[in-house]
């Protein structure tokens, strides 16, 4: 099995939906989130996440992301601790991979 993963648009959108769904997850990841790690389509949303959290100490609402960044993201309902664990592991790997590109 290969250690190299591909992160398609669906995966990147899923990561953003997780971040939108749980402010605590975003707080834990905000120092490694960089817009350039994402496809061009999602960069305005990531920039908004970062700037909004710095200015307002909160993540933007789905409506704000849609209006300001032009990206429609739906929160993920019923996120569990197991989902958090998966997300944190996968997102850290994603950020490391993208930082080396």
Predicted segments, located by residue:
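Noncatalytic partner-interaction/assembly domains of nucleic-acid and motor enzyme complexes
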Residues: 1-95
